[in-house]
Amino acid sequence: MASTTCTRFTDEYQLYEELGKGAFSVVRRCMKISTGQEYAAKIINTKKLSARDHQKLEREARICRLLKHANIVRLHDSISEEGVHYLVFDLVTGGELFEDIVAREYYSEADASHCIQQILEAVLHCHQMGVVHRDLKPENLLLASKLKGAAVKLADFGLAIEVQGDQQAWFGFAGTPGYLSPEVLRKEPYGKPVDMWACGVILYILLVGYPPFWDEDQHRLYQQIKAGAYDFPSPEWDTVTPEAKDLINKMLTINPAKRITAAEALKHPWICQRSTVASMMHRQETVECLKKFNARRKLKGAILTTMLATRNFSSKNPYKKPDGVKEPQTTVIHNPTDGNKESSESTNTTIEDEDIKARKQEIIKVTELLIEAINNGEFEAYTKICDPGLTSFEPEALGNLVEGTDFHRFYFENSLSKGHKPIHTILLNPHVHLIGEDAACIAYIRLTQYMDVNNMPRTMQSEETRVWHRRDGKWQNIHFHRSGSPTVPTK
């Protein structure tokens, strides 16, 4: 059926200057012609998006439509046109919260309390609506306007997910390194508490101008986070009230089940009794540290942008860290056209590609385990990795579709388990296609090395495709297709 090209955005809105840019999108100021009201239009080039990216875009729009709160950047319209999708948001003109703080003449604990209160109000609304943001960080905390006392607005729901109640599940490895929670780093089921951990990191920075977890080496940074290894060093923390430290401790609790919730945090004395509990003393040292923290965030962001534009990836740090200032170290950037080169240049880069790489590696690993079970003649181990309804096309079945594992039992009991000679298998050029969150397909060439009856080394080759499905957190092979040599080495 022929579809007419929608031009509703072009008809209803007038576009103006560029406000920002992403990999597949640009943000521009726009005006609704009928009302004269100004907005920010996120313009996504859908021609360049994969099916998975399309799903993410739909999810982001669906989530943003749900959220209507004074401390959240609101989505007003979502329009698809030929090759382009428009998301029309509030136009927020106050810039980043952290940039505004360093321009203030006066900044105290009480101000930090007011900032985190607004962030917590936004997080509470998200959680009440069944949304987990997953990427709370300074870059996503904006101010509604340049006016004094302008509202803090939570932005960028590109990584946000929908959850049912207090559901905990593995939703993928996503976020920004210094703000990731221990449960995400441990690849454990997670949910709303990940946002509260990030709030703890943000509050820590709001009070002293540097983050609780930092290391030049990303692996060591992750070890620190998993161990909850942060402290309140002198002299800067000596002037912070015990109540502020108590709230940070409750947010940076390793066990997510014991971590404070947004609703509980809003009832904490340091928040709800601010005027009598939070210190009013001006924190000049915090402002100075925060200036350096902001400068490095911007510099590293610029370096990353340049690297992405020029494809010049380097793992060396181009500048040294100023003494006495801590910062989180960044993410791995993968450039498919440039091999697996890595960069540790940006503190503020969101990771999701790392999750995709990890999931693909998981599929390769489970395929290797399955083949190891075949080579060792371990039928019980084989059936644990295979779905009971496994279907297959294989040379042994002479072109017939086989269902279940009983057909394979014969080979395990009469040939594979009887062989005492070593068998070695190599998977060449494995290609993994991820199909949503819980399904994947892997294609590869399988080389099997073995000793024949005359003790002569032999090699067999087969071409295989396996389809995997994850049930209850466990990958199972549901179908495979093999051509070429059979599984059992020929004599």
UniProtKB/Swiss-Prot annotation:
Modified-residue entries (Phosphothreonine), positions: T286, T350
Catalytic function, reaction form: L-seryl-[protein] + ATP = O-phospho-L-seryl-[protein] + ADP + H(+); L-threonyl-[protein] + ATP = O-phospho-L-threonyl-[protein] + ADP + H(+)
Listed InterPro entries: Ca/CaM-dep_prot_kinase-assoc, Kinase-like_dom_sf, NTF2-like_dom_sf, Prot_kinase_dom, Protein_kinase_ATP_BS, Ser/Thr_kinase_AS
Keyword Phosphoprotein: yes
SUPFAM superfamilies hit by this protein: NTF2-like (SSF54427), Protein kinase-like (PK-like) (SSF56112)
Keyword field: ATP-binding, Calmodulin-binding, Kinase, Nucleotide-binding, Phosphoprotein, Serine/threonine-protein kinase, Transferase
Natural source organism: Danio rerio (Zebrafish)
Protein family (similarity comment): Belongs to the protein kinase superfamily. CAMK Ser/Thr protein kinase family. CaMK subfamily.
Role this protein plays: CaM-kinase II (CAMK2) is a prominent kinase in the central nervous system.
GO molecular function term, any single one: ATP binding
GO cellular component: cytoplasm; neuron projection; postsynaptic density
Protein name: Calcium/calmodulin-dependent protein kinase type II delta 1 chain
Notes on how activity is controlled: Autophosphorylation of CAMK2 plays an important role in the regulation of the kinase activity.
Domain of life (superkingdom): Eukaryota
Compositionally biased tracts (Polar residues): 328-338
Tissues of expression: First detected at the 18-somite stage where expression is restricted to somite boundaries. At 24 hpf, expression is elevated in epidermal tissue and in the hatching gland. After 24 hpf, expression dimishes, but persists at low levels along the dorsal trunk. At 48 hpf, expression is restricted at a low level to the forebrain. At 72 hpf, weak expression reappears along the entire dorsal trunk in discrete cell bodies.
Subunit-structure text: CAMK2 is composed of four different chains: alpha, beta, gamma, and delta. The different isoforms assemble into homo- or heteromultimeric holoenzymes composed of 8 to 12 subunits.
Span of the signal peptide: none
SMART domains from the UniProt entry: S_TKc
GO biological process: regulation of neuronal synaptic plasticity; regulation of protein localization to plasma membrane
Annotated ATP binding sites: L19, G20, K21, G22, A23, F24, S25, V26, V27, K42
Enzyme Commission code: 2.7.11.17
Pfam families membership: CaMKII_AD (PF08332), Pkinase (PF00069)
Positions of the UniProt region annotated as Disordered: 315-354
Modification type Phosphoserine: residues: S314
Every Protein kinase domain range: 13-271
Active site: D135
